Amino acid sequence: MSTMTDRYAVIGNPIAHSKSPDIHARFAAQTQQDMRYEPLLAPLDGFLATVQDFVRNGGKGVNVTVPFKLEAYALATTLTERARAAGAVNTLKFDGADMLGDNTDGFGLVSDIVRNAKVEIANKSVLLLGAGGAARGVLLPLLHEQPARLVLANRTHSKALDLAHRFAAQPRLKVSTFADLDDSFDIVINATAASLASEVPPISPRVFTAHTLAYDMMYGAQPTAFMRFAAQHGATVRDGLGMLVEQAAESFYLWRGVRPETAAVFAELRAQL
């Protein structure tokens, strides 16, 4: 390996499970970029020191995962519009003293739905379940697609309302509790953590029809509980593996100026699950 090889990393805690090094190694080989990408475990109180050490040693950029996305947001000297809207950063690009903070999660979600699943968001009714960090991270890119309406639903109305207020200039954005959902939707996106516990958000099956795409931002070897529930009520289902690959491709493009092809990488990762 030449000393000129550019260094990138993903920082998190835990980090051993991350698929990002595998994804970016495939992107680099495909696009013939001279770079390496490694997982970095940061102590829970050591994110800043880990980043500073990485930059000192020639690091060009990092992806940031749980639990450091808010710290990355605070650390960035410049923020993209979508990072400001998300209130969190999953991608940092280093250029001298400048640290550009971006958030590619929403881009990844929209790309997977529109390009890969071939489902348009424009002029559709969209239901986004959850009002935490995952939901906030994708709201602006979803709204940019110009849905006919986007309903933000959460167990507690006040938390959904607080998040919606950050996007007050968006007349398409409505708020609901899970219990009050009664309409059907073209696209239903699960941004809650319920799937981690093999649970389903407490929503009426009436939100699904035979024409609904039910999308879980989680992924695994088997369909999630949310996907099984949606499929039982007629929906087409999709998990978040494609979102993971597409958000990685956007980070790669931000760093390298080259957009990798994602289809083969997605297929290889799916086969490994």
From Swiss-Prot:
Key words of the record: Amino-acid biosynthesis, Aromatic amino acid biosynthesis, NADP, Oxidoreductase
Any single biological process term in GO: chorismate biosynthetic process
Catalytic machinery residues: 69
Reaction(s) this enzyme catalyzes, per UniProt: shikimate + NADP(+) = 3-dehydroshikimate + NADPH + H(+)
Subunit structure, interactors included: Homodimer.
Any GO MF annotation of the entry: NADP binding
Record's function text: Involved in the biosynthesis of the chorismate, which leads to the biosynthesis of aromatic amino acids. Catalyzes the reversible NADPH linked reduction of 3-dehydroshikimate (DHSA) to yield shikimate (SA).
Binding site for NADP(+): 81, 130-134, 154-159, 217, 240
Family matches, as Pfam families: SDH_C (PF18317), Shikimate_DH (PF01488), Shikimate_dh_N (PF08501)
Protein name: Shikimate dehydrogenase (NADP(+))
Organism lineage: Bacteria, Pseudomonadati, Pseudomonadota, Betaproteobacteria, Burkholderiales
InterPro entries in UniProt: Aminoacid_DH-like_N_sf, NAD(P)-bd_dom_sf, SDH_C, Shikimate_DH, Shikimate_DH-bd_N, Shikimate_DH_fam, Shikm_DH/Glu-tRNA_Rdtase
Keyword Methyltransferase among UniProt keywords: no
Region forming the signal peptide: none
Enzyme class: oxidoreductase
EC number of the protein: 1.1.1.25
Pathway listed: Metabolic intermediate biosynthesis; chorismate biosynthesis; chorismate from D-erythrose 4-phosphate and phosphoenolpyruvate: step 4/7
HAMAP family assigned: Shikimate_DH_AroE (MF_00222)
Transmembrane segments: none
